[in-house]
Swiss-Prot record:
The lineage of its organism: Eukaryota, Fungi, Dikarya, Ascomycota, Saccharomycotina. This is ATP synthase protein 8. Its main location: mitochondrion. It comes from the Eukaryota. F-type ATPases have 2 components, CF(1) - the catalytic core - and CF(0) - the membrane proton channel. The keyword Transmembrane applies. GO terms for cellular component: mitochondrial membrane; proton-transporting ATP synthase complex. It comes from Wickerhamomyces canadensis. It is a single-pass membrane protein.
């Protein structure tokens, strides 16, 4: 089980943080604005 070998801790932390940063950028730049636009448009349509 390489997860328990201390030699691999730094490698797992590095790739974990890198993946977290990439996902954060992707969500904040692409996915969340689309969801927000959809939510706002539905809100305005329901108030008509």
């Amino acid at each position: 089980m390489p997860q328990l070998v201390p030699f691999y801790f730094l490698n797992q932390l590095t790739y974990g943080f890198l993946l977290l940063i990439i996902l954060l950028v992707l969500f904040s730049q692409f996915l969340l604005p689309r969801i927000l636009r959809l939510y706002i448009s539905r809100l305005f349509i329901s108030k008509l």
